[in-house]
Amino acid sequence: MIKLLKPMSLSILLVFILSFSFPFPTAKAAANDNNVEWNGLFHDQGPLFDNAPEPTSTQSVTLKLRTFKGDITSANIKYWDTADNAFHWVPMVWDSNDPTGTFDYWKGTIPASPSIKYYRFQINDGTSTAWYNGNGPSSTEPNADDFYIIPNFKTPDWLKNGVMYQIFPDRFYNGDSSNDVQTGSYTYNGTPTEKKAWGSSVYADPGYDNSLVFFGGDLAGIDQKLGYIKKTLGANILYLNPIFKAPTNHKYDTQDYMAVDPAFGDNSTLQTLINDIHSTANGPKGYLILDGVFNHTGDSHPWFDKYNNFSSQGAYESQSSPWYNYYTFYTWPDSYASFLGFNSLPKLNYGNSGSAVRGVIYNNSNSVAKTYLNPPYSVDGWRLDAAQYVDANGNNGSDVTNHQIWSEFRNAVKGVNSNAAIIGEYWGNANPWTAQGNQWDAATNFDGFTQPVSEWITGKDYQNNSASISTTQFDSWLRGTRANYPTNVQQSMMNFLSNHDITRFATRSGGDLWKTYLALIFQMTYVGTPTIYYGDEYGMQGGADPDNRRSFDWSQATPSNSAVALTQKLITIRNQYPALRTGSFMTLITDDTNKIYSYGRFDNVNRIAVVLNNDSVSHTVNVPVWQLSMPNGSTVTDKITGHSYTVQNGMVTVAVDGHYGAVLAQ
């Protein structure tokens, strides 16, 4: 196309004449060829494009849109303001070129106010118009997936910038054999406990129950292995499955929220562990997230007391119990609301605002949530189990009351520590709990990470059923699920390959360690908080529950294990480059034939091109790094191999092994 300058007004021309001795940036506006080049369009809320990704109510937000140099004649920001439930327009002005002279940047400012806003861009070239929002460019105006502006909503920086390590305590390390549950130590619902040797099968022997099989892992064991987690691997956030007193090995059937289970130690053991996690003597400063099982208790909790274990009368024993209204009975005593129909998990009744249950769980100064956030514990956040189901009167959640509860919970938690993390367990689109900035900071990213990664790399879904997607479908899935969330939520999502509820990634990949390598490279370079389920870093296998909770093989926990070594290197790389944590994300290649996926992570300091090869054979890939404004003649270095490459004609050519990747940084 022929490129012409925009006609200048007389006032601008006079300024130009009077300022001839100074450089004057001139917009390279397009001739009217009526064609917006989509391949040049880009915006997200990374540092290059948004000056205030977490604005206060008094901060205006200046946004930038990238286009090809000289390609468009005008651009506008169109935003919906919830203050007046109306659309508003902001004309954009040309701002600058990129360092390579390939792109223009246009900017516009949305004025400060406390209201939530949603914005998209209208881009014009003569009579041609394109639109751009969280789902990318389109020829027609979108009606969903706009970018978010949520004043005064901040997610913890340590969560965005950290790497998480999830531990199922009974199976990690036995640091104190004196507290081990032995075979026959107690019975629960008529079944005795069973003690197993470390490394043996997780399945119960005849006469026992899988949930009552114990291996001896405890908090002292976690404390003794902090050097492995924080130094060897480099992870700095620990998330523990439930640790409070409960009869089973998984502890999702709480008997006492205020006491650490004796099999794991005691409350002083927890204090010591937290102090050591926070310490920098054994690695980077760490953070601890506890599992809050607040939808239900166990049936052995004294509030319920189904087995008459306590002198006080629980709700199951008496309708005059002080805790009777903590639960919902349909026909007392045997018909009551429970979690997914499991009678061993009676569902808490949160009632109306100000209810006793709301008080004891989060509102009171001595509530469960506040007690552990305050000294002497000072935990750093809560992961909320079965969070969608929390409700009143036996209702099953995902309703107005559920959202009210989590809004109150947020106020209570942030009132103690504004930097505490709140992560809800949800298996689908958690937008209803995150898009208003008043409930969760983030969610478990089954839908936006675990499932698409599994289907693309292993050809199985996270429950090990056959399910395969192409590279293009993978990219589309990722883009669509990112668009569900505000950017600071995207950056805080819990991104895991496996967890305690699904089959192990290594089992889904048929034990092919190269597929674990590929998944790790993606996990550590994608948007969100990488979350390693203990053992995934060395390729631990395991089927459905309880097989996904095997005891940790400490002979593998060394850099001599190639997957552990790669995990260590990738975490080091992620920690080195903020662009991998809070930078922009741009798709570069989706090659379905060769199964190549490439994307850029970049900010105002670094530009990184990640290349993933999901094929079983090596491929030579031409990476269009011109999209990242990498200049010709400049050098990029693969941070995994150390090999360097020169940018030629806007491209970098790199050979990538099958089921492996490259992280090309400059």
Curated annotation (Swiss-Prot):
It is an enzyme of class 3 (hydrolase). InterPro entries: Glyco_hydro_13_cat_dom, Glyco_hydro_13_lg-like_dom, Glyco_hydro_b, Glycoside_hydrolase_SF, Ig-like_fold, Ig_E-set. Its EC number is 3.2.1.135. GO terms for biological process: carbohydrate metabolic process. It is found in: Secreted. One of its GO terms (cellular component) is extracellular region. The active site is at D385 (nucleophile), E425 (proton donor). Keywords: Calcium, Carbohydrate metabolism, Chloride, Glycosidase, Hydrolase, Metal-binding, Secreted, Signal. It catalyses: Hydrolysis of pullulan to panose (6-alpha-D-glucosylmaltose). Endohydrolysis of 1,4-alpha-glucosidic linkages in pullulan to form panose. Also hydrolyzes cyclodextrins. Belongs to the glycosyl hydrolase 13 family. This is Neopullulanase 1. It comes from Thermoactinomyces vulgaris.
